[in-house]
């Protein structure tokens, strides 16, 4: 297994500066949320750090990794390239980085789409991605406060945010 510093160095080379900073911000947010909500902060930090490991990979590579993963990929995911980096990233983390922790793999896998019955760690990564310091969409401050005061309500609001028919500037990355 790689050390945290080795993984940061790897990501710094692999990702754009903006995406690397975003990954660090998500990791920091996940660490804080995990501590508050009874999850392992170090595990949350690692999942947050790695959540976008394949976000900037070529589309063909993302598709190949996603299909190799043998994960249950929905038709909606297959038809939406912007979602491929979740399952591709989970497979990459397992096959290339040797991380086999199913909690981390699922948190990365579902960080863009969520799912019914998400674990607390999956929810934390989902939320950390939404409220990280680099986010600046309308009402992000409200979501940040809610995430630390009423996590279940924050998850509910997050689901509404992404299923609402009105366009919102929240770019999931």
Predicted segment positions?
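Non-catalytic interface/linker regions that flank or bridge core catalytic/transmembrane domains
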Residues: 1-2, 168
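Conserved small/polar residues in nucleotide/adenosyl-binding loops
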Residues: 162-169
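Divalent metal-dependent catalytic cores for phosphoryl transfer on phosphate-bearing substrates
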Residues: 6-13, 31-159
């Amino acid at each position: 297994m790689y050390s945290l510093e080795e993984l940061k160095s790897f990501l710094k080379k692999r990702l754009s500066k903006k995406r690397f900073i975003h990954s660090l911000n998500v990791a920091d947010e996940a660490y804080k949320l995990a501590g508050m909500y009874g999850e392992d902060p170090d595990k949350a930090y690692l999942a947050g750090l790695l959540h976008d490991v394949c976000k900037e990979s070529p589309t063909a590579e993302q598709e190949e990794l996603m299909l190799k993963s043998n994960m249950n990929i929905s038709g909606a995911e297959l038809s939406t390239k912007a979602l491929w980096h979740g399952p591709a990233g989970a497979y990459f983390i397992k096959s290339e980085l040797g991380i086999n922790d199913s909690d981390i793999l699922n948190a990365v896998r579902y960080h863009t789409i969520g799912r019914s019955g998400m674990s607390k760690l999956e929810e934390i990564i989902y939320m950390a991605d939404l409220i990280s310091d680099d986010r600046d969409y309308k009402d992000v401050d409200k979501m940040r406060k809610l995430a630390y005061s009423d996590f279940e309500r924050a998850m509910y609001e997050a689901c509404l945010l992404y299923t609402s028919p009105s366009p919102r500037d929240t770019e999931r990355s």
